[in-house]
Each structure stands twice: as structure tokens, then as C-alpha cells.
Amino acid sequence: MTGKTLYDKIWDAHLAHEAEDGTSLLYIDRHLVHEVTSPQAFEGLRMAGRSVHAPDKTIAVPDHNVPTTEGRDDPKNMTEDSAIQVAALDKNAKDFGIHYYPVSDVRQGIVHIVGPEQGWTLPGMTVVCGDSHTATHGAFGALAHGIGTSEVEHVLATQTLIQKKSKNMKVEITGKLAPGVTAKDITLTVIGRTGTAGGTGYVIEYCGEAIRDLSMEGRMTVCNMAIEGGARAGIIAPDEKTFEYCMGRPHAPKGAQWEAALAWWKTLYSDDDAHWDEVVTIRGEDIAPVVTWGTSPEDVLPITAEVPAADSFEGGKVGAAQRSLDYMGLTAGTPLDQIEIDTVFIGSCTNGRIEDLRAAASILKGKKVKDGLRAMIVPGSGLVRAQAEEEGLADIFKDAGFEWRLAGCSMCLAMNPDQLSPGERCAATSNRNFEGRQGRGGRTHLMSPAMAAAAAITGRLTDVRELM
């Protein structure tokens, strides 16, 4: 009998029913909810006279719309639409009795940071959320992916989800990473290799020595961007780092339940004879600090490279490349490390954790933000913010000239007051560089927190290794 992948094992453990055409009904262990994709779902429950099937497994937190400045719990400081959505989530959480972390709660933050922090995300689970970056939770050996609003309602009502099984892809990062190379460089390099459609129809398992060497924060960064490579989900087999991270979290099992869970978690790995539909192998030593130059995450190159010419691409990509160059205001042949920036944003569900802030602080300590540059650091949760202040990181940021914000999605997306102006160029640690993603006409370059910190000092895209 052929062995199973980690994805196969979790799928089989949660399969409630499978039709002849492969359409399956999966049980869902955790349902994460935020203010943007949930209002219609809760209203659907009301109209049908239904309750939430498993309120103890449903967790809500406002993150996308909330301002990151003081006084943000006052609706007057939000846009009208944002205030309505946050108020709706507050009411729905109370009406339906689900777990809720309001803006006033220190535990509030980005949903994909709050879930792991509070121990809601555990190995072997199925986790869904009405948000495309739910794959973040795959770092724990969980099957986690985004769902649409109609599916949000379905999970609220039944704690199940209808779907078809994906294929298995293995992405192996062998060997060691060089100094200055991070998890963000891994995940962007993978997307640059496979393209944004390379993972379509697959669940990606990331493995190899370089992946195992990553902290849990680093693994979350890698899995977070699986969707940018087209995959349904990204996943990493749990190990001692995973178990240590989960132990003692507020909603992790305790005592005998912990021991029983741990015994099962240790079986969650891909068998040696498991079948892979696709395999991608990249040597860790070949990965360099990278930045994006265009308007797709696959438009990524080492910081030592030059802006590519549109005619260096093939087929239909020539037109797309030229459109990217025009939108980004770039000229082919320009060294990437000579591109001047206006703004630096460090945060998001990709890079808003304590390790990310430490990395940025290590570059910024004793230095100043370039004159005329706008720079902000937005912790991924209130607890991350408190820890950064306790460790003295916040003082480093403020002394350098960064704005020290409250937790939220912030400038990752233009759904709150933190936005770029037309033509404004940003070095960002977020996950998407689409046209208008950070604000209409805004120009986004994706990179690691350390690279963004380096850019803040020099005022241009910079090889962080020069400042280490």
C-alpha cells in the first residue's frame, strides 16, 4: 500500500463523506472570522433561523478595517463602511456566542497571528477563515485555507465544508541559508520559480533542512504566501519546535489531553513512500535577499539584480511585464538597489510577529530613518506590541524615526486609513504587490523586515547584508 502525505493523513482524518465524483464533506476544527467577510454570513444565519453549530470552535477578531492609531475604538475615527463592519462583528459575536477579541482587548490583532498566539491553531487540525492568507496556520501541520462568504455561512451553520481534494506538491529547500536570508526570501523565491499559478490545484508541503531550521514565526511566513503561488494551502510537518510553541497556550490541551494530542501529532509527517504529483527542489545556499519589482509576487529578483526588460519575457508575459514597469514607474536596466522609496511598512500577517520586529530592530538600532521618508511599524497583535515594548524594541523604532502603531492589518491593504498616495513607493513586508493593493496608484515592493529596515535607513531598496 502506498504511503500517505501529511495532507492525505489530515484529509482522511476529517473526511465525513465522499461522493462518487470526489466531492467531499470535511469536518472543520477551527473557524476564524473577521469583520469583512462575515456580516453577510451571520445575516444568512439569522434569516434562516439558525445558530452557530460550534461556537466554542469559532473565533472572531476585527483586523482589516481597524485604524492603528490611538482612539481607534471610536467609530468616528473609522470610515463609515469600516465602522459598520466592526460594529456588526461585535454584535454578531455577542448574539451567536462565539469567542471574540474586540479592538479594546490587548489580545486583538490580525486573525492569523491571534489564532496561533492563543493556541487555537494546533497540529493536524482543519482551519478555515474568510481570508486568503489562512494558509499561515499550515506552519503547525494544520490543513488551513481561505473560504468565501457563502462558505463562511456554511461552516458557521454546520462545522463542515464541501470541497474536492487537491493534488500533492513537495517544495524542498535543501541545505542552509546564508546570513541575511530569511523565510520571506524563501517564500518569494519559491513563487518566483513556480509562478503565481504553479501551485494551482495543489496543497504544498514545504520541507528540507532550511525549512526545519526556521522558527515557527519563519514557518508561518513561508506558509502565509502559499496562496500567492496559486496553492490551496501550504503545510509543514510539526516537530519539537511546533510542540514547544503550542505548549501552555491558553487554548492548547493540558495534562492528559496534551499527552494524547502529542502522541497523535508525532504521527503527522509524510511517509517515505508517499506519492507526490509535483516536486520542486531549491538549494538554500542559492537563495539571496530578494525584492519584487513588478505588480505580482512572482516579479521577484535578488536585490543585486537589475529591473528586467519587458522583452526578456516570453509570449503573453511581455505585455504584462511592460504594464508592471509602467505602473511601477521603473526603467529596465536600473539596479534594484538604486530605486528610491517614499515609505516603509513593517507588519502584516506575513511579517508582524515578534521575531520580525527583532530582525528589523537589529538593523535599525542606533540609526535613523532617511530624512523625508515615512516609516511605520505595525505589530501583528496587542501581545506582540506589548512584548516588543518590554524588550525595548519599540524604543529602537521610535528613536530611529518610525511610527509605532497599534495592531491591525494596516497598510497591507487599502481598507483602513493607512494607505499610499498615487505614485508613492513603499518597501513593504506584506504579501501582495498588486496594483492599488496599498492604495490607488501606490507602488509596492515586497521584502523581509530586515530588508525593509535597511531601506528605511538609506531611502532606497538596499541589500541588508551591507548593514549587517
From Swiss-Prot:
<dbReference type="InterPro" id="IPR033941">
    <property type="entry name" value="IPMI_cat"/>
</dbReference>
<dbReference type="InterPro" id="IPR001030">
    <property type="entry name" value="Acoase/IPM_deHydtase_lsu_aba"/>
</dbReference>
<dbReference type="InterPro" id="IPR036008">
    <property type="entry name" value="Aconitase_4Fe-4S_dom"/>
</dbReference>
<feature type="binding site">
    <location>
        <position position="412"/>
    </location>
    <ligand>
        <name>[4Fe-4S] cluster</name>
    </ligand>
</feature>
<dbReference type="GO" id="GO:0046872">
    <property type="term" value="F:metal ion binding"/>
</dbReference>
<dbReference type="InterPro" id="IPR050067">
    <property type="entry name" value="IPM_dehydratase_rel_enz"/>
</dbReference>
<keyword id="KW-0456">Lyase</keyword>
<dbReference type="GO" id="GO:0003861">
    <property type="term" value="F:3-isopropylmalate dehydratase activity"/>
</dbReference>
<dbReference type="InterPro" id="IPR018136">
    <property type="entry name" value="Aconitase_4Fe-4S_BS"/>
</dbReference>
<protein>
    <recommendedName>
        <fullName>3-isopropylmalate dehydratase large subunit</fullName>
        <ecNumber>4.2.1.33</ecNumber>
    </recommendedName>
</protein>
<comment type="subunit">
    <text>Heterodimer of LeuC and LeuD.</text>
</comment>
<dbReference type="GO" id="GO:0051539">
    <property type="term" value="F:4 iron, 4 sulfur cluster binding"/>
</dbReference>
<keyword id="KW-0432">Leucine biosynthesis</keyword>
<dbReference type="Pfam" id="PF00330">
    <property type="entry name" value="Aconitase"/>
</dbReference>
<keyword id="KW-0408">Iron</keyword>
<keyword id="KW-0028">Amino-acid biosynthesis</keyword>
<keyword id="KW-0100">Branched-chain amino acid biosynthesis</keyword>
<feature type="binding site">
    <location>
        <position position="349"/>
    </location>
    <ligand>
        <name>[4Fe-4S] cluster</name>
    </ligand>
</feature>
<dbReference type="GO" id="GO:0009098">
    <property type="term" value="P:L-leucine biosynthetic process"/>
</dbReference>
<keyword id="KW-0411">Iron-sulfur</keyword>
<keyword id="KW-0479">Metal-binding</keyword>
<dbReference type="InterPro" id="IPR015931">
    <property type="entry name" value="Acnase/IPM_dHydase_lsu_aba_1/3"/>
</dbReference>
<comment type="similarity">
    <text>Belongs to the aconitase/IPM isomerase family. LeuC type 1 subfamily.</text>
</comment>
<feature type="binding site">
    <location>
        <position position="409"/>
    </location>
    <ligand>
        <name>[4Fe-4S] cluster</name>
    </ligand>
</feature>
<keyword id="KW-0004">4Fe-4S</keyword>
<dbReference type="InterPro" id="IPR004430">
    <property type="entry name" value="3-IsopropMal_deHydase_lsu"/>
</dbReference>
<comment type="pathway">
    <text>Amino-acid biosynthesis; L-leucine biosynthesis; L-leucine from 3-methyl-2-oxobutanoate: step 2/4.</text>
</comment>
<comment type="function">
    <text>Catalyzes the isomerization between 2-isopropylmalate and 3-isopropylmalate, via the formation of 2-isopropylmaleate.</text>
</comment>
